[in-house]
Amino acid sequence: MAKQKIRIRLKAFDHTILDQSSEKIVETAKSTGAKVAGPVPLPTEKDVVTILRAPHKYKDSREQFEIRTHKRLIDIISPSPKTVDALMRLDLPAGVDIEIKL
């Protein structure tokens, strides 16, 4: 595991939970002696849904809803087995989606 790199992508609808989770990951990796790059904020996806307010006619009256997906990227360079073990035991909130690539 000397020349490996772990790339972690985090996604969440709430940016505060996302930032707290990324700080937890960075602190855990740094405490085990690994070199960390990030968290890098990636572009936010914005999904907009337009619906009619009335059930039948009144097509001019519409309402728009949006949901934003915030993303962060963290690279852990040259992780030790201790780093991987600490990251596996890390407890993160339920609203955060995590993708890990080696």
Swiss-Prot record:
What's the short name of a Pfam family annotated to this entry?
A: Ribosomal_S10
Q: Does the keyword Ribonucleoprotein apply?
A: yes
Q: Which PROSITE patterns match?
A: RIBOSOMAL_S10
Q: From the UniProt record, which GO molecular function terms apply?
A: structural constituent of ribosome; tRNA binding
User: Which Gene3D superfamilies does this entry report, sorted A to Z?
Assistant: Ribosomal protein S10 domain
Is Acetylation one of the keywords? no
Biological process annotations from GO: translation
Listed A to Z, the keywords are: Ribonucleoprotein, Ribosomal protein
This protein's GO CC annotations: ribonucleoprotein complex; ribosome
Q: What does this protein do?
A: Involved in the binding of tRNA to the ribosomes.
Subunit text: Part of the 30S ribosomal subunit.
Entry similarity comment: Belongs to the universal ribosomal protein uS10 family.
Name by which UniProt lists this protein = Small ribosomal subunit protein uS10
Organism name = Clostridium kluyveri (strain ATCC 8527 / DSM 555 / NBRC 12016 / NCIMB 10680 / K1)
